[in-house]
């Protein structure tokens, strides 16, 4: 399990100072999702927390933020793993589940690893 918490304004200030930082941290899809919301920084902060929580849960030491992609669709967000994150999850034989939340001031996420027993993902 991994957890992360972030003050939203901290990320918003960092992105304002370094506009290209968003490209290093988030995929095109993640940035587009956030841009379509009233306060993009709130949604990017939750995704940043999810990436950190997944890295902690997997025990990653060297990884890229883009190795963990938060996918929003119907229902709860899911993660799509790439690079080192995907390799580590495969080596452990686990799937990753995330839960994201935010208030007006803070964002947080929890990542939980679970084993696949029959090749199918565990029920949600």
Q: What spans do the regions from the language model cover?
A:
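Core catalytic alpha/beta fold that binds nucleotide/phospho-ligands
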Residues: 1-124
């Amino acid at each position: 399990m991994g957890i992360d918490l972030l003050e939203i304004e901290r990320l918003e200030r960092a992105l304002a100072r370094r506009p290209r930082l968003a490209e290093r941290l988030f995929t095109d899809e993640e940035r587009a999702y956030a841009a379509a919301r009233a306060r993009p920084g709130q949604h990017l902060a939750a995704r940043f927390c999810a990436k950190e929580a997944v890295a902690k849960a997997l025990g990653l030491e060297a990884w890229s933020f883009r190795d963990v992609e938060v996918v929003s669709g119907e229902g709860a967000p899911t993660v799509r793993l790439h690079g080192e994150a995907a390799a580590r999850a495969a080596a452990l034989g686990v799937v990753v589940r995330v839960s994201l939340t935010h208030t007006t001031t803070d964002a947080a996420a929890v990542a939980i690893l679970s084993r696949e027993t029959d090749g199918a993902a565990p029920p949600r």
